[in-house]
Regions:
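Cleavable N-terminal signal peptides of Sec/SRP-targeted secreted and luminal proteins
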Residues: 2-19
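Glycan-recognition patch characteristic of GH18 chitinases/ENGases
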Residues: 17-127
Length: 127
């Protein structure tokens, strides 16, 4: 019985020690760094991280998800293409940012105010 308990304990430790998350962060303004320091999605090692977060998207006045940069739509595609080399990679999009809350009303507060405004946001994210 003791051997079975030890075996089960070792199996539990083994199962949990192999599971980890390494979350990395990519900023959309890395493309504007000076020459030699510019950084694009293709420069990311897709096996370095289990999850990579792209920053940022924003919530517009219509409570829809929107791009910050003029080329974010193309950058999202390039970012998600990292999964072609590593299908296990999880890519995520951060909404907000350091100046997203500027103004008299928070875009998040405005968006969550009613079921209808939440639905508009959710539908825009799913597209």
């Amino acid at each position: 019985m003791r051997a079975l308990t030890v075996l089960l304990a070792l199996m539990a430790v083994s199962a949990t020690s192999n599971a980890y998350y390494r979350v990395c962060y990519y900023t959309n303004w890395a493309q504007y760094r000076p020459a030699g320091a510019k950084f694009f999605p293709e420069d990311i090692d897709p096996f370095l991280c289990t999850h990579i977060i792209y920053s940022f998207a924003k919530i517009n006045q219509q409570n829809m998800i929107a791009m910050y940069e003029w080329n974010d739509d193309k950058m999202y595609v390039r970012f998600n293409n990292l999964k072609e080399n590593n299908p296990e990679l999880k890519t995520l999009l951060a909404v907000g940012g350091w100046n997203h809350e500027s103004g008299t009303e928070s875009p998040f507060s405005r968006m969550v105010r009613t079921i209808a405004t939440r639905k508009v946001f959710i539908d825009s994210v799913k597209r």
